Amino acid sequence: MSAVRIGQYTLRNNLILAPMAGVTDQPFRTLCQRLGAGMVVSEMVSSDMSLWNSRKSSLRRIHEGDPEPRSVQIAGGDAQMMAAAAKANVEAGAQIIDINMGCPAKKVCNKAAGSALLRDEALVSEILHAVVSAVDVPVTLKIRTGWDRANKNGLNVAKIAEQAGIQALAVHGRTRADLYTGEAEYDTIGAIKQAVSIPVFANGDITSPEKARAVLETTGVDGLLIGRAAQGRPWIFREIEHYLRTGEHLPAPQLDEVERILLEHLAALHAFYGDVMGVRIARKHVGWYLATRPGGKEFRARFNALEDTQAQCANVRAFFSERRQSLETEDGQGVAA
């Protein structure tokens, strides 16, 4: 894998944790970077700075100790507000500004932001030029292939982005209308890569080392954005990086390591958000970690009723202890047979 540069920053590999609202908070970003991500991107931050005073918004902003280069994603539909938000985030420590024109959520699109912007190429150009002019750090862009299948203008938007001075482009291989259904359009991503000279990253359905290599080979992109596949599996980055580098699979993490990672993640969530909010946010992450494990579904129902940090950690330890005992019993029966 050749090194990928975004402006003055050389990434340690070409695998990026995709920004996901409600998921890629500081604890998760830090964990994914430690487990192999070449770069991580913050949760989406509104360009409406009047909303930044809420506790929720302040937690979404960049923090000391965030992995570098610190990339912050902003969203909005007004060029001057976007420029001001970019400037404020850079003053707060952001080293890269990422512009969201890919989010398909109704509450974002209804405000003429996210992927709704793809319907107005003139506004796209205005926003990109305004943000690039406002800051002296690299500006990147995330898009979809278009608004719907009858209006797939990702190629045009990519060219507009390059002309505006965007330093790298991430493309989710679906239209806004597709949401997350159907197959990702890797052919469209490949065409976009061929049309511009800036680094292009593919996003969508990259769930395994083999899929990662196939997408890189078929599209010719410079790197990959991995989002949903990292939920409950933050070690996917080191698995893909190792496979791309050596052609061999890393062994899956042992039960003890999964337990250590999950407990580390819980402790970070509790410390970052405080006990009440931390307990609440931890529930979905634990659900993702244990979704495919025997007894995970039943455990999640019990775990979601827990109301304090110590009980959460104790119950996770008990779950893994029971799993180890179960595996030892199964191994013993296998030997006896």
From Swiss-Prot:
Gene that specifies this protein: dusB
SUPFAM superfamilies: FMN-linked oxidoreductases
Pfam families membership: Dus
MF GO annotations: flavin adenine dinucleotide binding; FMN binding; tRNA binding; tRNA dihydrouridine synthase activity
Entry cofactors: FMN
PANTHER family noted in UniProt: TRNA-DIHYDROURIDINE(47) SYNTHASE [NAD(P)(+)]-LIKE
Entry function: Catalyzes the synthesis of 5,6-dihydrouridine (D), a modified base found in the D-loop of most tRNAs, via the reduction of the C5-C6 double bond in target uridines.
Active site as annotated: C103
UniProt-listed InterPro entries: Aldolase_TIM, DUS-like_FMN-bd, DUS_fam, DusB, DusB-like, tRNA-dHydroUridine_Synthase_C, tRNA_hU_synthase_CS
Amino-acid positions noted as binding FMN in the UniProt annotation, renumbered to this chain: P19, M20, A21, Q73, K142, N203, G204, D205, G227, R228
Reactions the enzyme catalyzes: a 5,6-dihydrouridine in tRNA + NAD(+) = a uridine in tRNA + NADH + H(+); a 5,6-dihydrouridine in tRNA + NADP(+) = a uridine in tRNA + NADPH + H(+)
Descriptive protein name: tRNA-dihydrouridine synthase B
Domain of life: Bacteria
Top EC class for this record: oxidoreductase
Enzyme Commission number: 1.3.1.-
This protein's UniProt keywords: Flavoprotein, FMN, NADP, Oxidoreductase, RNA-binding, tRNA processing, tRNA-binding
Protein family membership: Belongs to the Dus family. DusB subfamily.
